[in-house]
Amino acid sequence: MTQKWMKTFCGYCYANCGINVLVKDGRIGRVKGDPDFPGSRGYLCPKGAAAAAVVHSGNRLQHPLLRTNGRFERISWHKALDTIATRLHEIRDRHGPETVLQLRGAPITQEIRDGFVQFMSAYGSPNYTGPSHLCSSPRRLGQELVLGNRTVADFKGTNCIVIWGANPTDSRNYAEGLIPERFFTVIPQAKKRGAKVIVIDPRQTELATSADEWVNIAVGTDMAFGLSLINVIIDQQLYDREFVEKWTVGFNLLKEHVRELTPEWAEKITEVPAGTIRHIATVYATTKPAAILDGNGLDQHPNVVQTVRVISMLAAITGNIDVSGGNVFAPKPKTAPYPTVHPQVKHLASEVIPLFPRVTAPYMIDALLTGKPYTPRALITHHTNPLLINANYRRVRQALEKLELIVVFDILPTATADLAHIILPAASDFERHGYGAWAGFDGGYVALQQKIIEPIGESRSVFDVEYELARRLGLKQHYPWTTNEEWINYKLSPLNVTFEELQRLHVIPVTPGIEYNKYSAKGFKTPSGKVELYCQKLKDHNQDPVPVFRPFAESQDLIEQYPLVGTTRRPGNYVHTRFRDVACLRKIQPEPLLRIHFRDARLRNIGDGDLAIVESPEGSISIKAMVTDEIRPGFVVVDFGWGNSWDGGPNVNILTSDQARCPLSGATPNRRFRCEITRNPVD
């Protein structure tokens, strides 16, 4: 028996924890955290520890499959690639390249982020994207409109920690250089030196139980809460006058805008007492420095971009931007530009969300169902499951079924793959080379995601597949690389780092640590060079230049029929819709749960463990109830990520709508839906 330990990093979530992998006779054996890896320093969550079970799963896709007469049959790679290339050639000639869509997964690894981007651009279609409307990108846009760039929370020297719509002990925010285990030490250490901890969340998360203040806010009302905080801070003159006068534009307009947006006004919307709002505003504004960690709980709402603008303004007017212990800019190592060619046409939602950098899936769905601005014909997906992750499942399914060609590239079967015409087996993160590049408080660094074992079955790297398709379509001249190793060399060339060096060193520092107060010399990366409390760019695009909270468009009849407000929760032991076939992870949480308050459960004769029916205007699901006091009455939480044919659980997006959208990012309200709950009579 041969065995050896090899270094790489995990690609199962944004944390990208460094790991040491024991390889026994060509198979993955034990996996443990790498104490030398800068970001994780030895920590490893259950997902990473289960790597062997994932890679060697009996459910792995191992061969190309072609749908024939309603069934999948095994075919060769040669036939699969030829078939796809022929269809793409026909579609391009008949309908134009822009009618081919591409969806990729969350950019957890660089291969997922970059996969098929060069191909789509060379082919001529601008309609490629990831789940950007659901995660991070809307928040990034909100911060960029105010501050010019994304910030991260600097907890090292802070005296006030605000966790807003985030749950970092369960779902790590990768940008902070913190992991769940270490985060458990950050809070006690901060509190020991007198720091205040504030958690703003409609659910009593683990952090909320130990916080100084848990703000039990109504779902989707964070903007109103933030505007009322600004009202108090300005009214009580708790803002940083020197910073505001020198480094902001539009303060007087903001001041006038929030004059009537008092805590009493916000209380009616947020269900947070006015006294609590005043207290939180005072604590945050007077406890310096203060850092805000925002999270995915803010993303999936129609007002997400404007909400994050408000949060950014809070940090700015209190002087907590780009200071030690506040919200700081952590520049990520700059890699080579990608793609190297660009389509000649704009993406199909460019007129609707012109400030967002890419098309989003809901507008692809619209185009498929309406034919406007044109009718898409084909879809290539890799490492994603759009049928389950997007709001309004029935509408998404109806749209996908209209496509002439669906190609799914993944390591495991998915609900989306069930609709595919061709399924291609993907190599796992342990079966091909990749790289990672991260910002860090102590400096940015790059690392090698190393090929640990040979690919299972006939699985291939995404770059192998897209290059072979490009070659068949006469596009290979657009590729500055042909292999994963050449791709790594190309992307890291501005950093003077090579694949060979990464093989030897594994981790290479490439940028210095965080610098504070950079704006004093360079200004902010906004049109004015200052923090923009009033945004002329938004005004020019007929959007609110100062954030305006608008009530939810819900009739009294709707509220009476569906009196409960629901949201979703992603269990931390899974990755979106993946890994529910992994026994050791399934043991942690074998099935999805509905969290419902004791009072609401009693009124509906629902006991803990009973099956309940959750019904919304869009549809209904049956799910086991968990009766709890960690949420407010009138509010329920449904677990997200189930719905594959083999996992035995319901898809929460049967309940959600995709019609109310953020006008700046296209974000849909996956995190808020009206519903009613009854006991399942078959229980």
Predicted segment positions?
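A glycine-rich phosphate-binding loop feature that marks nucleotide/adenosyl-phosphate handling sites
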Residues: 246-249, 284, 327-338, 481-495, ...
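Extended redox/cofactor-interaction regions of prokaryotic respiratory oxidoreductases
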Residues: 114-189, 195-200, 224-227, 312-418, ...
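Flexible, glycine/charged-enriched surface loops at secondary-structure junctions
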Residues: 96-99, 239-244, 291, 322-329, ...
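Glycine/threonine-rich phosphate-binding loop and adjacent beta-strand/alpha-helix elements that clamp
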Residues: 430-455, 470
